[in-house]
């Protein structure tokens, strides 16, 4: 069990309210236009908060994929009905054309180098049916660039003192986030997350290289500093004819 996985699990489930996941899924389903019963997947599902929302919103057996054994185990308990597979987004353990839609919430696909992101998008394109949707939800890089440095500190009951420090490189469009937890027992956990972001033109180019088409943002308007998230609809290229 890595410190990285433990920190992600303990901080996210305390600071991310269920309503946020419910809203994320509602918007994503509205963009994907996929009927209940069709095969859908949460890529980088974590401990299953979005899977649970998918189940609650009519998709009773969504597929969740994550490479963390800890998070997959948590997702099994958190999202009854979901099917869970431990796997890497760069090599999805799925047949070609097996998904009607896929969702990736909060940058799970963009935690590595740019080449990793391209490989992951190509894998997603491979597993989507022609015309199938991929909805990406990330933080808004325009908003991050307006405040490139931030620090958060809070004493969290049952967890300890949590410190989060973030530095955003606007030139590279990369955010470096270090989270540290000091537990009541005196244990200190720390991990750094390097998250790559894409402005819409760059995301469209990356999608095109992967065999996907960038369709639109939600809302369908240019990003500004006040836009909370980047939510993008990509689509698998339709077969000719």
Which residues are covered by each model-predicted region?
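Conserved class I S-adenosyl-L-methionine
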Residues: 1-35, 37-44
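Conserved SAM/SAH-binding loop
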Residues: 47
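Class I SAM-dependent methyltransferase SAM/SAH-binding core
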Residues: 50-91
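A short acidic, Gly/Pro-enriched loop at the edge of an enzyme's catalytic core
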Residues: 93-102
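A short glycine-rich, Lys/Arg-flanked "PGG" loop and its adjoining helix->strand segment in the class I
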Residues: 118-130
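SAM-dependent methyltransferase
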Residues: 135-204
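C-terminal lobe and adjacent flexible extensions of AdoMet/dcAdoMet transferase-like proteins
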Residues: 202-241
């Amino acid at each position: 069990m890595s410190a990285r996985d433990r920190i992600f699990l303990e901080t996210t489930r305390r600071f991310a309210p269920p309503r946020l996941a419910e809203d994320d899924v509602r918007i994503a389903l509205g963009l994907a236009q996929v009927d209940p019963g069709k095969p859908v997947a949460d890529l980088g599902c974590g401990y299953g908060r979005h899977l649970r929302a998918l189940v609650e919103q009519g998709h009773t057996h969504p597929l969740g994929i994550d490479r963390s054994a800890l998070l997959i185990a948590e997702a099994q308990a958190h999202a009854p009905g979901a099917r869970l597979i431990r796997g890497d987004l760069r090599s999805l353990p799925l047949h070609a054309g097996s998904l009607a839609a896929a969702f990736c919430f909060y940058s799970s696909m963009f935690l590595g180098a740019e080449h990793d992101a391209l490989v992951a998008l190509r894998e997603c394109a491979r597993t989507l049916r022609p015309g199938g949707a991929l909805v990406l939800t990330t933080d808004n890089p325009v908003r991050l660039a307006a405040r490139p440095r931030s620090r958060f500190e809070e004493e969290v009951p049952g967890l300890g003192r949590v410190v989060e420090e973030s530095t955003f490189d606007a030139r590279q469009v990369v955010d470096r986030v270090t989270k540290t937890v000091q537990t009541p027992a005196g244990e200190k956990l720390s991990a750094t997350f390097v998250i790559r972001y894409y402005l819409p033109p760059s995301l469209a180019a990356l999608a095109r290289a992967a065999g996907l088409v960038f369709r639109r943002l939600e809302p369908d308007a240019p990003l500004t500093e006040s836009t909370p998230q980047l939510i993008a609809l990509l689509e698998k290229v339709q077969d000719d004819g």
